[in-house]
UniProtKB/Swiss-Prot annotation:
This is Peptide chain release factor 2. Peptide chain release factor 2 directs the termination of translation in response to the peptide chain termination codons UGA and UAA. SMART domains: PCRF. It is found in: Cytoplasm. The gene is prfB. InterPro entries: PCRF (IPR005139), Pep_chain_release_fac_I (IPR000352), Pep_chain_release_fac_I_sf (IPR045853), PrfB (IPR004374). Belongs to the prokaryotic/mitochondrial release factor family.
Length: 372
């Protein structure tokens, strides 16, 4: 890397750091962290375990924000030192390589920090519950459902998030009929709420002996995992419970007893299932948690509708309702119809490279809130 290019890159990194610092009161943040940690050492802190965990989580969020910012400033200082070293010995290949690597990492971390600053909605920091439901399109659609399931799993793993399968139903011939996963990690819901909606797929179907082009649709729903501090009233009389034998994806490790639980909320028609726990009681408890999350989300959507704020609304599976198109034939493209962000590398996207789409969505939402 040429020194002049490195200096330009460093100037850009420092400009971003200065912009971040303008919205960050580091002294106040440090005091808030100290206050949380003092509370954690008080007698009786663990008397209410749920409340204690909430305090710890909030403190971790603040510490993560502080440490991420300080890491950026340290990286900028190290890059400045490397530039000076390379200026003294321009032929030092090792220093040049280290400088290029340090700049690339700092640029990546600046982008990640910037992305986190866009997560301002309630429950953005929460874990995410993500559901995949193939729509019209038959076997082609269920196969695309499996591709989306894999895409989100890959994305989560690349970010160090934990993925738990809550419910999985394999398709008759290929793919999946439906799947529900929990993605555990800081800001998982904030990142993935961009994925809620109908995804459209166009390709030459491997299941069509005539080699014709097919269009399929898959609906994705995303909701935050709510903790017990959120009160949602659910009457026992409104719930119908069914039990079934649960097992792994594709029917592996099927239990000989019915531990899987399916709950139907009759007033709304909402159906949730859980097979993640080992006991029927555990699955009922977790299914109830999912139901409350869905009911809470439903109420939020009603409030948004009343304010005519319908962005992010999940629409009916079918023509014209998609939020994103994945085209593999006659050309290669993935395009988000809300932000107009697109790429001609669909395989990278299907392998989990969703961050550019997530970033574009969050920037788009910010522009809707602040049109000027």
């Amino acid at each position: 890397m040429e020194i002049i290019d490195a200096k330009h890159a460093l100037a850009d990194i420092q400009e971003n750091i200065a912009r971040f610092q303008g919205t960050l009161d580091l002294e106040a943040l440090t005091e808030e962290i100290a206050d949380f940690e003092n509370r954690m050492t008080e007698p009786g802190f663990w008397d209410d375990n749920t409340k204690a965990q909430k305090v710890i989580e909030e403190n971790n969020v603040l510490k993560n924000r502080r440490d991420s910012f300080l890491n950026l400033t340290n990286q900028a200082e190290e890059i400045e030192v490397l530039i000076d070293m390379l200026a003294e010995d321009p032929g030092d290949v090792d220093t040049a390589t280290e400088l290029a690597d340090s700049i690339a990492q700092a640029q990546k971390d600046v982008e990640a920090y910037n992305l986190e600053q866009l997560l301002t909605e309630p429950y953005d920091a929460n874990n995410a519950i993500l559901e995949v439901h193939p729509g019209s399109g038959g076997t082609e659609s269920t196969d695309w459902g499996a591709n989306l399931y894999r895409m989100y799993t890959r994305w989560a793993q690349q970010h160090g998030f934990q993925v738990d399968v809550l419910d999985y139903h394999a398709g008759d011939e290929a793919g999946i009929d439906s799947a529900t996963i929990k993605i555990t990690g800081h800001n998982a819901f904030g990142f993935l709420r961009s994925e809620k909606g109908v995804h459209r797929f166009v390709r030459i179907s491997p299941f069509d002996s005539a080699g014709r082009r097919h269009t399929s649709f898959v609906s994705v729903d995303v909701m935050p995992e709510l903790d017990d501090t959120i009160e949602v009233e659910v009457r026992d009389d409104d719930i119908k419970m069914d039990v079934f034998r649960s097992g792994g994806a594709g029917g592996q490790n099927v239990n000989k007893v019915s531990t899987g639980v399916r709950l139907t909320h009759e007033p709304t028609g909402i159906v949730v299932s859980s097979t993640v726990e080992r006991t029927q009681y555990g699955n009922r408890d977790y299914a109830m948690k999912l139901l409350k999350s869905k009911l809470y989300q439903l109420e939020l959507e009603k409030q948004e509708a009343e304010r005519a704020a319908l962005t992010g609304e999940k629409m009916e599976n079918g023509w014209g309702s998609q939020i994103r198109s994945y085209v593999l034939h006659p050309y290669q493209m993935v395009k988000d119809h809300r932000t107009n962000y697109e790429t001609n590398q669909p395989q990278q996207v299907l392998d989990g490279d969703l961050d550019p789409f997530i970033n574009a969505y969050l920037q788009w939402q910010l522009s809707l809130k602040n049109p000027n």
